[in-house]
Curated annotation (Swiss-Prot):
InterPro entries documented for this protein: GTP-CH-I_C/QueF, NADPH_dep_7-cyano-7-deazaG_red, QueF, QueF_type1
One GO BP annotation of this record: queuosine biosynthetic process
Entry GO terms, CC: cytoplasm
Single GO MF descriptor: preQ1 synthase activity
Protein name: NADPH-dependent 7-cyano-7-deazaguanine reductase
Cytoplasm listed as a keyword: yes
Tree of life domain: Bacteria
Residues given in the record as substrate binding sites: 70-72, 89-90
Gene source species: Thermoanaerobacter pseudethanolicus (strain ATCC 33223 / 39E)
EC number: 1.7.1.13
Active site per UniProt: 48 (thioimide intermediate), 55 (proton donor)
Keyword Protein transport among record annotations: no
Length: 133
């Protein structure tokens, strides 16, 4: 029996398709407080860089704002830009953290990616940033 799937592959895009420029921020009126802001979506997806198969995840973005909040529509477009990008799960979560920290300069930020099982293994990635004191 031959492996008819051995050479099968779906096209993927490179990192240049991640649309960081779509991200926008809005001013935060309570920078003196340590309010925790949390966004959760079950719709995050990227693709495996080797097979092109989808990697779907629940994504939690948790942060303590300094002077800015992320504008939610821009966040949705940004996250959707990962849809056909071939990127490792661990790299995607760290890239999201880096891009949001650059935009918002928060006091603290944590990105959690809970990826659906593949091959019987579920992956949970936690990337953190804390502003130096």
């Amino acid at each position: 029996m031959t492996d008819k799937y051995k050479e099968r592959r779906f096209d993927t895009y490179g990192y240049e398709k991640i649309d960081k420029e779509v991200l926008e921020s809005i001013e935060y009126e309570y920078p003196e407080k340590n309010t925790i802001v949390e966004y959760i979506t079950n719709e995050f997806s990227s693709v495996c860089p080797w097979t092109g198969l989808p990697d779907n995840a629940k994504l939690t973005i948790r942060y303590i704002p300094s002077k800015k909040l992320v504008e939610l529509k821009s966040l949705k477009y940004y996250l959707t830009s990962y849809r056909n990008v071939g990127i490792l799960q661990e790299h995607a979560i760290n890239r999201i953290l880096d891009d949001l920290v650059e935009l918002l300069q928060p006091k603290f930020m944590e990105i959690i990616g809970e990826f659906q099982e593949r091959g019987g293994i579920a992956t949970r990635i936690v990337a953190k940033y804390e502003k130096e004191k």
